Amino acid sequence: MSENKVLSDLEIAHNATMLPVEAIAERAGINVDALELYGPYKAKINTAKLVLPRGKAPGKVVLVSAMSPTPAGEGKSTTTVGLADSLARAGHKVMIALREPSLGPILGMKGGATGGGYSQVLPMDDINLHFTGDFHAITSANNALMALVDNHIFQGNQLGIDPRRMTFKRVLDMNDRALREVVIGLGGPMQGVPRQDGFDITVASEIMAVFCLATDLDDLRERLGRITFGYTYDRTPVTVSDLGVEGALTMLLKDAIKPNLVQTIAGTPALVHGGPFANIAHGCNSLIATSTAMQLADIVVTEAGFGADLGAEKYMDIKARIAEVAPSAVVVVATIRALKMQGGVPKEKLNEPNVEAVAAGVENLKRHVGNVAKFGISPVVSINKFGSDTPEELEWLLAWCAAEGVEAAVADVWGRGGGGDGGDELAAKVAAALEAPSNFHHLYPLELGVEDKIRTIVQEIYGADGVEFSVPALKRLAEIEKNGWSGLPVCMAKTQYSFTDDASRLGAPKGFRVHVRELIPKTGAGFIVALTGAVMTMPGLPKEPAAMRMDVDADGNPTGLF
């Protein structure tokens, strides 16, 4: 092998020496009898058996977000891992809280989702492929519910469920556009009641959201019972508790709800648990994992999906309303290539030097930084370094941040790792930010109506002139008001590539309106989803899926997971 060969993420992961998970638990302060082992390097934590340190103040949360991304992503997970490793290297007691990867994007576009280079969580292939079975359990609970609903309709429909007004779909942890719209119950009177149906991807399921927002097993059961899956013929909402199956669904999730403990390459403890997308769901790991990490560590580094307009806004306005997990510091990840794309450079030319394009695209970063400040937090910009970045481009961006009064650091945590010195400057700036006074607040009060909440988000965060509602969305607004759901927060479903609902409009557009085509009350999770533009809750695969490059070697080890 050439000394100059750049190793892939998978090769780096396979070359790493992992510690037994019991050693990672000891490092985190987790008593061994709270562990439920899944082999030598993975464990679930039974939080009921966790012996917590007396008198310890809750750890401070660092939320990692980003500017609007390129299709390959800008390295939030890599930065999260590298930053945590660097903080640990500086002597802080740190834990990571991350989402679990979804199989659809792994086989589709991303190829893996556990960080990259020398800033990864391990065992990388296990986490990317099935892990501890949490997504299987969530998928099973979701589809069990729909099987029970359709069976109830077939067996006489005592609740009077209207098959034309179902609001809940079956799910699959895969990108499969062919399943977006289907018809079920065909084949005669013994095969069920025919109706139009469809599939969502598992990470868009309300059960995934409930799973990630529940505070404990009892809260999980209560939230599952509150899920509205459809309406009766007289348009009365029907819930899981009406059907009487919340106990069965809780049973299917009783082990999955326990957080998963793994490690970084540098040996930092990491809780990887839950995984809703941020463009079509709320985009944060489980609340149980975040809260557990805060009880054990002094600093918890977590991330929220896609740009600060999506995951970070939802962390602040949805997750941080349920428990005391508000961030004390926020990191906005920026890359030279993303700035170039936002400045109008085509994908195939992103690796070419172009300071002018960086300058043209920086308005996108500026809006994201300003948006974080609207929650009362001054962010730190982490410039995730790529090999194609030139000194001139990096110097220009650092100078721009300085002129804007924004703390910034170049982080080479992919190439040098956070366990090395690749994230030391970033860690120092984040540690300083954690000591600064925080004035965190939500973007809007819950007393505001749903229409006004949406208008606030699109105007304050996206920079839109206003919002337009389709006729079906306006009808659903009236239903939301009638059923007493107006006090719920809003979860916007929007393309991740633009502040608008049009993925092709890059930069920091002005003079546009956001189009809300549908509103979906998620009464178990406790928010209203607003579908905008053409965003899909069941994605499709690209023309050349990453799966085409994947295989196993003669020893059964995966290859091609980037």
Curated annotation (Swiss-Prot):
Keyword set, alphabetical order: ATP-binding, Ligase, Nucleotide-binding, One-carbon metabolism
For whether the record's keyword set contains Transmembrane, the answer is: no
Question: What are the disulfide bonds?
Answer: none
NCBIfam families under this entry?
A: PRK13505.1
Name recorded for this polypeptide = Formate--tetrahydrofolate ligase
Concerning its family, UniProt says: Belongs to the formate--tetrahydrofolate ligase family.
Q: Which domain of life is it from?
A: Bacteria
Q: What class of enzyme is it?
A: ligase
What PROSITE patterns does this protein map onto? FTHFS_1
Tell me the pathway.
One-carbon metabolism; tetrahydrofolate interconversion
For this protein, the record's Pfam families field holds:
FTHFS (PF01268)
Listed binding positions for ATP are 70-77
